[in-house]
């Protein structure tokens, strides 16, 4: 009887310990999710405030009213916030990357405006949206948002704030490549060719990679450059951003209901997190949470 009671107590103790451990992990995960959400929400609020200050509705109203509207009408993308997070991960203040993050948002806004023009030949998977301005105005405004983003970058070249002109120039080159024919334009063009008969995992991944993937890769690389990262760190974060953006595209864009997408997303998550293995510390956990919100170190 004594032996049986002893075994019972041991099992109870083990069960209690296991439950306690699970409770600790669960509570830590909940706290981590809340902290990570706050981390990204704060960054996005700062970017929005910066853009509202940079693009107020002012004279000439015919130019700045549609630009202001289209800047904030675009759906949320995490690429600008990733730019800030990468800069902070490299040990620099987010103010160093704010203009770059805003420029990346403007690129996203410009392409969103062009994608949703009420014209024939629009991708079959693009829903109708409400238009506040004539198509010609939205077309021209989208064209104007791209150079305006580069203007924000050039104006941020303040030596008194330790902004290195060479870094700014490199970031401008990164963003112009993103906006060019081998970047998002390529993805948009390939998406135009899609129809119900030719959607397979290969074309889905390609379109998502060239659109959201390249956008996030650019954001992460620009943040790392402005944060003072070494070349290997910049390239690791570029690859991380590419995987993150491709995942985001697959989750929310073309082919999101296609069979095999979930399996591909899980593989991309593994590849993305692998790029961060050499980066340590609290900020690494924060930047990882863009694809794994419950990531926690106990």
Question: Can you say where each PLM-predicted feature lies in the sequence?
Answer:
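All-alpha prenyltransferase/terpene-synthase fold signal
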Residues: 1-298
